[in-house]
Regions:
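Conserved Radical SAM active-site core
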Residues: 3-4, 8-87
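Conserved AdoMet/S-adenosylmethionine-binding subsite of the radical SAM
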Residues: 51-189
C-alpha cells in the first residue's frame, strides 16, 4: 500500500504523485481495505510512510497482530526505532546523486535487524564508490541484507552488475521489475 506525503525530493523520484495525491482514511478503514484481498503480506511504501508516524506505527502493529507479514519501505531520513520488531524494514540510504544525501539519519542503522534490508539506489560511479565507503565505515556487511539498485534511465543495470562482480561485493542486485514488464510510468502495478 502506498501512503501519501514525503519529506524528501530525490532528483530521480518516480512517485511524485505520492507527495499529495491520496485519500484520507482511518487506520481501521485501511485494515478493512486490506482484508478484502486474499493475501497475508502487506508492504507499506510512499512517499515516506513515516511522515504519518503515529498512524503508520499503529497500522503496522495492528496488521502484525492480525497475522499479516508486514514490510515497510522508508527513505531513511526519519527515525525507525519505534517500528514494531515484527515488521521487516527496507530502508534507503540516499546516495549523492539523489540530492538528499544530507538527510540520511545514520543512527537508524543500529535498529536494523538481520532480516531487514538496506537499499542504495545508485545513479553513477560516484554513488557506487560512496556506497562502498558507507558500507565499510558503518560495518554493514552481515548486519542486514544490502541491496544495490540503479536509478532507472541513468545507469544501465549491466554496468552496476559488472562493478559488483569486479569488486566481489556480497550484495544483492535489485531491479524495479515493474518498469521492465509494464511501461516505466505505469501506476498501481
Amino acid at each position: 500500500m502506498r501512503l501519501t506525503y514525503c519529506n524528501l525530493r530525490c532528483t530521480y523520484c518516480d512517485t511524485e504523485y505520492a507527495f499529495y495525491d491520496g485519500k484520507d482514511m482511518s487506520v481501521q478503514q485501511v485494515i478493512d481495505e486490506v482484508e478484502k484481498y486474499n493475501c497475508k503480506l502487506v508492504e507499506i511504501t510512499g512517499g515516506e510512510p513515516l511522515v504519518q508516524l503515529e498512524d503508520c506505527l499503529d497500522l503496522m502493529k495492528n496488521l502484525c497482530d492480525l497475522g499479516y507479514e508486514v514490510m515497510i519501505e522508508t527513505g531513511g531520513s526519519l527515525p525507525i526505532k519505534d517500528i514494531d520488531t515484527r515488521v521487516k524494514i527496507i530502508m534507503d540510504l540516499k546516495c549523492p546523486s539523489s540530492g538528499m544525501e544530507k538527510k540520511n539519519l545514520y543512527e537508524n542503522i543500529q535498529y536494523l535487524k538481520k532480516n531487514d534490508e538496506l537499499k542504495f539506489v545508485i545513479g553513477n560511479r560516484e554513488d557506487y564508490e560512496w556506497t562502498i565507503q558507507i558500507i565499510k565505515k558503518n560495518i554493514l556487511q552481515g548486519k542486514c541484507e544490502i541491496l544495490f539498485s540503479v536509478v532507472f534511465g541513468e545507469l544501465e543495470p549491466v554496468e552496476l552488475v559488472s562493478w559488483i562482480l569486479e569488486d566481489k561485493l556480497d550484495v544483492r542486485f535489485q531491479l524495479q521489475m515493474h518498469k521492465y514488464i509494464w511501461h516505466p510510468e505505469t501506476k498501481g502495478v
